[in-house]
Each structure stands twice: as C-alpha cells, then as structure tokens.
C-alpha cells in the first residue's frame, strides 16, 4: 500500500507541472486570440466599442497574469533557489496581485455591462444607470484602481511589519515557523477580503438578469408561442457568460479559503501546484467561454480552425 501511494505521489509530482504548463499555454493562446481579433477590428474600423475595449483590456491583463505564472513555474523548476529568494517572492507576489486584480475587476465590468445593456426593468434608477453605462463602467474601474492601491499598500505594510517583528524574535524554530505562517495567513485574509468585493457586486447582477429573463419570458408567452426572440437570446448568452465567470470565481475563492483554513498544507509542493492549477483555470478557460459567446470571436475562431484543417491539404497540393 505504501509503495502504491508513493507511486501515485511520484506520478502526481511529475504530471501536475505538465498540466499547469499546458493550461497556461492554452490560456495565453485564447486570450491572445481574443485581443488580436479586437485589435485588428479596431485598426480596420478606426474605432472600438465599449464592450470590445473591456474584452481587449481583459485579455491583455490575463495574458500578463498567465505569463507571470508561467515564468514563475519555469523559474521554480529550473532554479528553486532563485524562486525561494525573498526579493523574488515579493516581486512575483506584487505582479501577480496587480494582474489578477485587473483580470477579476475587468470581468466584473463586463458582467455589469451585459446586465445594464440586456436586462429590462422599469425602475428609474436602473434606467438612469442604463443610459449612462459608460460612466458606470468608468466609475467601477476607478474604484477597482483605488482598491488595488489599498490592497498593495496594506499587504506591503503587513509584510514589512512581519519581517521587522520576525527579526526581533530570538526563540525556537517551531515558534518562528508558526509566527511566519500566522503573518502569511493575515496577508492572505486581506487579499481574500479585497477579492470578494467584485464577487459581491457580480452576484446581484446575475440574480437580476435571471429575474429579467423570467419576466421577459412571461410577457413573450402571452404573445408568441414556441419562439425565442432576440432579447431572450441575448439574456441567455449573457447568463452563460456570467454563470461561467461566477462558477470559476467561486472555485478560485474557495481554493484561497482552503489555503487560509488549512495553511499547513502550504508546506506540501503538490498542494501548491494544485492551487496554481485552480488559479490558472479562471483566466484560461473563461476566455474560451467569452469567445464562444461572442459572434465575431466565434466566427474568427471557426475561420482559424477551418484554415488549420485545410492547410495540410494545401501543402500536399503544393508538393505535388
């Protein structure tokens, strides 16, 4: 039994980095494709709509996030001593926090945009926000920047305090380890609180979208039987995007909460790799949900797949 468990452990230790590497590459390709299509459309039309601006900025932030994670993985595998250096950890943490914060908040801006553009309510407050959707998105983005600054400031202050107190301690190794773990848990708790804000903002929009779809569907049933109008289709597409965002976001937050509650697991390399795979799943796979939910991106992806399918036949024809 012990031999079997050791074999499973050895296999997992070799397989998990490969899974993470493939996941990050898939995410970089998906987000890169999304940014490229929108940039080409911008060059062609000389203008870019608000939703395309959000999608392009979101894709760019996620490309940066995934590249930071990929470089961190490569450095850890190739030079573990460099990866464990305090300065390297601090720089990598700050870069990850910035890119991850922007990725989550831009996805939240996209959720709010879909809600204001697609939902139908007669409330004067909703109509006021709907007619000023660009200002609403701008305000949300500015609030996210303030929270990012606050997050970075508080986390770096907390780290500096922990380091200063750590150097004053002159007692047993076990106490130092527990003290250091407590400091890192405090930093993690602060990070979870800051990252919970966009989730709290996105969840009501999801519920209101469902309610808007339900009321719209009831009205349509009274007039048209067995048909789905454009508004209903738009509601379903928006809901698919928001559901995917919230589902992946929940998994992301739950993995961070698991780290907080069971911090002793952070000593285990396999658990750290598993957490990185969970973190990478959010920016990697959500991009493909966005591609499938956008007609222009979906058509562009189908064109690329068709070209890749026909390319070998074209090369064979040239060889003949």
UniProtKB/Swiss-Prot annotation:
Glycosylated residue positions: 170
Q: Which domain of life is it from?
A: Eukaryota
Which Gene Ontology cellular component terms are annotated? membrane
What family is this protein classified in? Belongs to the G-protein coupled receptor T2R family.
Q: Which residues lie on this side of the membrane: Cytoplasmic?
A: 36-62, 116-135, 213-240, 292-320
Where in the sequence is the signal peptide annotated? Answer: none
The record lists its disulfide bonds as none
What protein name applies here? Taste receptor type 2 member 109
Q: Read off the InterPro entries from this record.
A: GPCR_Rhodpsn_7TM, TAS2R
Pfam families (UniProt xref): TAS2R
Q: Where is it mainly found?
A: membrane
Ordered alphabetically, the record's keywords are:
G-protein coupled receptor, Glycoprotein, Membrane, Receptor, Sensory transduction, Taste, Transducer, Transmembrane, Transmembrane helix
How does this chain sit within the bilayer?
Answer: Multi-pass membrane protein
Tell me which parts of the chain lie in the Extracellular compartment.
1-14, 84-94, 157-191, 262-270
Tell me more from the record.
Answer: Several bitter taste receptors are expressed in a single taste receptor cell.
| An individual GO BP term | detection of chemical stimulus involved in sensory perception of bitter taste
């Amino acid at each position: 039994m012990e031999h079997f468990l050791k074999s499973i452990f050895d296999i997992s230790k070799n397989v998990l980095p490969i899974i993470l590497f493939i996941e990050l590459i898939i995410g970089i390709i998906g987000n890169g494709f999304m940014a490229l299509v929108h940039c080409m459309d911008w060059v062609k039309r000389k203008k870019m709509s608000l939703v395309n601006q959000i999608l392009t900025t979101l894709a760019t932030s996620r490309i940066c996030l995934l590249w930071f994670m990929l470089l961190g993985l490569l450095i850890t595998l190739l030079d573990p001593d460099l990866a464990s250096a305090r300065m390297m950890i601090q720089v990598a943490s700050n870069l990850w926090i910035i890119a991850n914060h922007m990725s989550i908040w831009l996805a939240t801006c996209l959720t709010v945009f879909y809600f204001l553009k697609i939902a139908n309510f007669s409330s004067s407050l909703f109509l006021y926000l709907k007619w000023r959707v660009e200002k609403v998105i701008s305000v949300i983005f500015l609030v996210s920047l303030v929270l990012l600054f606050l997050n970075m400031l508080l986390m770096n202050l907390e780290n500096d305090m922990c380091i200063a107190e750590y150097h004053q301690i002159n007692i047993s190794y076990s106490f130092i380890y527990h003290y250091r773990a407590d400091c890192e848990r405090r930093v993690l708790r602060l990070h979870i609180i800051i990252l919970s804000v966009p989730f709290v903002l996105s969840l009501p929009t999801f519920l209101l979208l469902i309610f808007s779809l339900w009321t719209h569907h009831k009205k349509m049933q009274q007039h048209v039987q067995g048909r789905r109008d454009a508004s209903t289709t738009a509601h379903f597409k928006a809901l698919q995007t928001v559901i995917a965002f919230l589902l992946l976001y929940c998994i992301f937050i739950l993995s961070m909460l698991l780290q907080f509650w069971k911090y002793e697991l952070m000593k285990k390399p396999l658990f750290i790799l598993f957490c990185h795979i969970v973190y990478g799943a959010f920016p990697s796979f959500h991009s493909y949900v966005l591609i499938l939910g956008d007609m222009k991106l979906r058509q562009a992806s189908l064109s690329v797949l068709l070209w890749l399918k026909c390319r070998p036949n074209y090369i064979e024809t040239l060889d003949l």
